[in-house]
């Protein structure tokens, strides 16, 4: 059960000046002023960040997580970004009203951009069966976006498959009156920072080893952006944006059990973004958008206590979407078709992971674990068709109605692959292999159909509005029929939108995590030479859901 209380108070004040007109009469006017403040949380449970507010707010590494950091509904992972790992540029996990970070829904122009491959696991540790992932399918650079909307309560029925909240990012449309090219560059580095490190962590931090996190005592960050807006013909134009965010981190290559450092190496963390939207205003009734999007990230890691454990981990996402807005005489119809490819991978430099009692690495000898576990990856292709019909407002007696209806179909084609055979074992005192496991080369697929229907209506009488709605979801993975009711009421006390009370009840069903099925496939490629292999099967699972009771008060 999620209980949400949303207060909202907006107070404005200014010095009053007086002026004298030709008739010697005094009149009051407010001097011109500009107010800079964090974006408030409106009473209806959503926060809208325009491109202007995105430019004003501090966005750190340029991720959506950084943009939402100051929102009172959002809580950041306190262990992910600390003074110990300032060189990291990956998006941070966010929790909305205390829900799991991997149960948020991310969208780009209304199409799902959620990575449901393995969003609950962001570990950078070596693994033969578990691939690190994140709930954000695209690592967007917010400086290239037109706006971002966070829905944290009273979420409309058109959004589903989440327990926490919804983050909807919009890519810029071209503006015929504002053709321009924009270049940007930012940089920061460890030499410009002063970090206060706990005495228990200071030695490991200065070495640049991997302890509770991947320490980054020596780093350089560089951020490059290029964007342009251009009209190509009458009522037809394009916007595009490119960015590279890069962090170069110097860490220890290997640290022995007694703290001896055997060399240092530079590890690179890169996020590339490319976004483009072609827009055609065909007529007063028809508007077409063609959107292309790409983000790619890669990060180099090693485990400083394991020699020769270098590996590259990353994410690549790309897709396209076509939108058509149709203005009918009695309604507005929006149709969207899209395809998105989202993938995660881990590529080790070595294919054998083993522990031996006596090994030599440089000038260091003793017990050690070394090597890697080969190359594994997983990906999903999402094919989306969705449509929404917004009826024009009409009245029945003294009561007005503004209904809308929608449907969505997503086919998810997921696959996982181990690109080469790898193995792990322990060499005992007698020089024999124990705990020997072989991970076979292989590839497997998993296909899921997702169906959605929804409808809602805004019913208004005088200064009171009711918004009932219902959403239906079904997929052939868990085969659950999920019905989500929505009810919201709004009272505009003085009928001038200065004092408003909102209350409601909603149910939100979470999304599927494909890793459950993909891990079944990967586990089937595992052979235990010195024991029985373990297999896990998932069946008869229910879809998790949250019930929300919310009340909000807003005073302007």
PLM regions: where:
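Outer-envelope beta-barrel architecture signal
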Residues: 64, 102-104, 144, 177-181, ...
């Amino acid at each position: 059960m999620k209980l949400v209380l949303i207060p909202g108070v907006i107070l404005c004040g200014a010095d009053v000046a007086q002026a004298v007109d030709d008739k010697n009469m005094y009149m009051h006017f407010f001097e011109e002023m500009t107010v800079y403040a964090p974006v408030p949380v409106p009473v209806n449970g959503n926060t809208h960040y325009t491109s202007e507010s995105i430019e004003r707010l501090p966005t750190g590494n340029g991720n959506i997580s950084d943009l939402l950091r100051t929102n009172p509904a959002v809580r950041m992972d306190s262990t992910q970004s600390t003074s110990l790992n300032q060189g990291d540029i990956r998006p941070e996990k966010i929790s909305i009203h205390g829900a799991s970070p991997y149960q948020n829904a991310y969208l780009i122009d209304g199409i799902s951009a959620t990575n449901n491959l393995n969003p609950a696991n962001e570990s950078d540790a070596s693994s033969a069966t578990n691939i690190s992932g994140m709930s954000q399918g695209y690592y967007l650079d917010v400086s290239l976006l037109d706006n971002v909307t966070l829905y944290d309560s009273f979420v409309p029925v058109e959004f589903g498959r989440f327990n926490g909240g919804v983050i909807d990012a919009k890519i810029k449309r071209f503006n015929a009156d504002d053709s321009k090219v924009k270049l940007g560059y930012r940089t920061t580095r460890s030499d410009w920072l002063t970090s206060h490190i706990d005495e228990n962590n200071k030695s490991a931090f200065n070495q640049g080893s991997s302890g509770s996190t991947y320490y980054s005592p020596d780093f350089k960050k560089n951020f490059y952006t290029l964007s342009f807006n251009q009209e190509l013909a009458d009522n037809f134009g394009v916007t595009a944006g490119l960015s590279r965010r890069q962090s170069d981190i110097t860490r220890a290559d290997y640290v022995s059990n007694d703290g001896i450092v055997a060399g240092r190496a530079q590890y690179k963390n890169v996020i590339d973004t490319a976004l483009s939207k072609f827009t055609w205003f065909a007529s007063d009734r028809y508007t077409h958008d063609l959107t292309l999007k790409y983000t790619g990230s890669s990060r180099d890691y090693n485990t400083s206590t394991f020699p020769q454990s270098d590996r590259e981990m990353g994410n690549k996402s790309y897709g396209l979407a076509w939108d058509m807005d149709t203005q009918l005489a009695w309604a507005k119809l929006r149709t969207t078709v899209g395809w998105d490819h989202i993938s995660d991978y881990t590529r080790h430099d070595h294919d054998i992971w083993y522990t031996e009692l006596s090994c030599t690495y440089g000038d260091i000898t003793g017990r050690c674990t070394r090597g890697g576990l080969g190359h594994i990856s997983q990906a999903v292709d999402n094919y989306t068709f969705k449509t929404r019909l917004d009826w024009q407002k009409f009245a029945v007696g003294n009561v007005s109605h503004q209904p809308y209806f929608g449907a969505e179909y997503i086919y998810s084609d997921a696959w996982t692959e181990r690109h080469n055979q790898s193995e792990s074992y322990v060499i005992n005192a007698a020089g024999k292999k124990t705990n020997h496991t072989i991970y076979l080369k292989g590839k497997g697929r998993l296909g899921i159909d997702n169906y959605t229907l929804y409808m809602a209506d805004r019913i208004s009488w005088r200064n009171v509005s009711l918004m009932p709605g219902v959403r239906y979801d079904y997929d052939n993975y868990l085969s659950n029929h999920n019905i989500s009711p929505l009810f919201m009421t709004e009272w505009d006390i003085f009928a001038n939108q200065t004092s408003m009370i909102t209350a409601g009840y909603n149910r939100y069903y979470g999304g599927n995590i494909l890793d459950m099925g993909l891990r079944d496939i990967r586990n089937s490629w595992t052979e235990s030479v010195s024991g029985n292999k373990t297999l896990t099967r998932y069946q008869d699972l229910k879809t998790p859901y949250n019930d929300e009771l919310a009340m909000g008060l807003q005073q302007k």
